[in-house]
């Protein structure tokens, strides 16, 4: 897994092309899928020791096909969750082509990875959109590609294939660590994904009238995973 913890936290674009699901055990279409999702300032390598111990268990080894989701962990959580959803759709289609007889998924998330896992069991729509924008998405003056990025981040369905989620030290109510002064300094140098930077700039320049006060605050300040892990984060 070609992720380096700190650089992947700070420099999204350098690692963006490596984001996605990686199969870490042999393909077995008749098995259930278990997906491991690492946390902030981490990488798929964090699961190495756990996987070695897991593979030693014959019952678990025979039941599950293992995958891991790798991602640059400094980007905003909704953006990363949208990418995980896309990766899950691609994985399900791939396994179906290979003759998968079932598509039951277990997600295991550590730290922020647990928040991404939880997002796969949730639904979102107009109620969440209206917290940020005061016009419908189709009336927003942005390019069609940027509109789809927004749609994927805010309008989504849960995955019926996800039958179980295991949380490992997950900050469901935020983390005080993300609010300390040192982390705030780190947050200031986290690189925003280029797609999001362009989208935010376009909204501020052409559609600022469409933003709610909360939306305007987010658009002007920007938001990354460290900001969103603060207990006071909206």
Question: Which residue stretches match the model-derived regions?
Answer:
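Serine-dependent carboxylesterase/thioesterase catalytic core
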Residues: 34-40, 69-221
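Short amphipathic alpha-helix adjacent to the substrate-entry channel of hydrolases
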Residues: 48-64
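Alpha/beta-hydrolase fold catalytic core
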Residues: 7-20, 25, 200-234
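Intrinsically disordered, low-complexity boundary segments flanking structured domains
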Residues: 53-57, 152-154, 227-230
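Amphipathic alpha-helical segments in well-structured domains
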Residues: 47, 51, 81-84
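Flexible, membrane-associating and regulatory peripheral segments of lipid-active enzymes
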Residues: 1-36, 43-49, 65-69, 90-100
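A general structural signal for short secondary-structure junctions and capping/turn motifs
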Residues: 26, 98-99, 155-158, 229-234
